[in-house]
Amino acid sequence: MACCAPRCCSVRTGPATTICSSDQFCRCGVCLPSTCPHDISLLQPTFCDNSPVPYHVPDTYVPTCFLLNSSHPTPGLSGINLTTFIQPGCENACEPRC
């Protein structure tokens, strides 16, 4: 259920930009306040395994998240500008597709 390769995810950092971190993979989803039983993390800079910069494990926060294209109740997204980015070289590795 991981999106892209292990530890391979690139998302612009920001106060409303978080990722699910129940494991070390970049999942196909964006964590926002909801009832999804996963930990969310404030996103720190992450890099592909072949990057010269060490992978930074995000800090875990409250157990809530919202997975895109899931059956979980969606949170109120009114007024939130959300943009996601797929790191070059990871597009074809997503399963399921984002």
Swiss-Prot record:
Disulfide bonds: none annotated. GO terms for molecular function: structural molecule activity. Keywords: Acetylation, Keratin, Repeat. Residues 3-59 are annotated as: 4 X 5 AA repeats of C-C-X(3). Sequence repeats lie at residues 3-7, 8-12, 47-51, 55-59. Wool. The modification N-acetylalanine is found at residue 2. Pfam families: Keratin_matx. One of its GO terms (cellular component) is keratin filament. InterPro entries: Keratin_matx. The keyword Acetylation applies. Interacts with wool keratins. Belongs to the KRTAP type 3 family. In the wool cortex, wool keratin intermediate filaments are embedded in an interfilamentous matrix, consisting of hair keratin-associated proteins (KRTAP), which are essential for the formation of a rigid and resistant wool shaft through their extensive disulfide bond cross-linking with abundant cysteine residues of wool keratins. The matrix proteins include the high-sulfur and high-glycine-tyrosine keratins. This is Keratin-associated protein 3-1. It comes from Capra hircus. The gene is KRTAP3-1.
